[in-house]
Amino acid sequence: MEDPIKIIHKYKNNNGRIQYHINIFIGDIVDENCMRILRKIKNLDLYTSLTSLETREIDILEKNYGEYWYEKFFNSYHINNTKELTLKNSVRMRELRSLYTEEWVNRHFVNYKKRLETTIFNYEYVVKEDRERRSVKRHIRRQQDDVEELLDYRTTGHPLPPALNDEQYVMSRIESSVETDNWCADNLLEEQLTESELNRELKKLVSKQNLDYSTDKPEDSESEDIELEDSESEDSESEDIDQHGGQGPDDDEFNANFDDPQFDEFDFGNTEDEQNVKLFEMEVEQDLEDVDLLFNDIDETDKNSKLTTREIKEAISNEQYDRIGKKIVDFDESRDNSMFDENLKDVITKTYITNQYLFKDDTIKTIRDKICCGFKNSNKFGENTYIIPSHQYLWSEYTYQGKIDRVMIGQKWIIRNDILKLDVEPNTNTSVKKNSGEIYVF
């Protein structure tokens, strides 16, 4: 239990002023010597703690909580503020150098900021990177679809392309038509046109080769044969193509069924991106329908609470039951009548929770339950009131690129939803939430 977690309880007092309670879940496996030192620094700030503790006491804290033990008991705002004020005060720096080595002062004060910048990415960065990657792919795909071949008919300034013989010319025409029609290869009409064009070009090539070797025929018959071949190819082409449109004998108007496969090239709703968007919107709608039932089974009210309490007392002695209840820390009401908002950098009072310990792999439900069993709510809401797990709103703060970033804990992530675009840290000014856009709708 060398890495206790701090739960900072933010609330408003009787005068509507923001106050903070720092609750540190240290657990019950703490030796008496270490506990005595923790009680000594309970109401001390960081600088006073560093200068008032003896070397033996510092060694005990480092043995139990590591070299940076003060991070476990002071919030980051207070640590950064103390560091900045100490670096600017030569008297404080001189006193620290007299108590600690120069290496220790440089590592814990001068270069302390570099140690905080350890996070290489955050949740927002991951989401942004994924959306940018999809946007770039979509943009490249559209550019490829919109690119048109630039035709250059200049005869000077650049070499002319090599001349093609008849066979190469026909093959280039075939390859060109195949590449052009590749994007709609599933279209039956386009396939028929490509096949008919191929037949026509092949017949022209065969007829021309036959005419070149037929020297005994007059020119008139040659031209006549060419015209006949063209007409035959046109007839064959007309036979291969399915004619659409026109007015039938019994049709007074044109009716088109756009569900037909030949109109797939105009069905922009069937693209992969559009299908993904529709699927995502359906999932979001389903999430919105289930959001009220997300934590529905977290707090099951015990209808026979008195009977349950009596059974628990029968299982354990009354003295042990009272001892367990006394371990739950009472709510500190000393600042309920304060007229000023409290700043986290000035909060130094620490409350140690010894009957619970938060592990890094605890589920959100377990964390909520341990908070409920760790400290009580204010008595102004009633006698022996607790912070109900389902009524707890949790968020975490961490340093990313030199700035404080926040992330919700236990809240369902819903992207591209205007209704649930809320502040991670609730705005203390409740007047901005009244009749204000999406908050009013929510």
UniProtKB/Swiss-Prot annotation:
Annotated region (Disordered), positions in chain: 211-269
UniProt subcellular location: Virion
GO cellular-component term (any): virion component
Superkingdom: Viruses
Alphabetical keyword list: Virion
Composition-biased stretches (Acidic residues): 221-240
Protein name: Uncharacterized protein R326
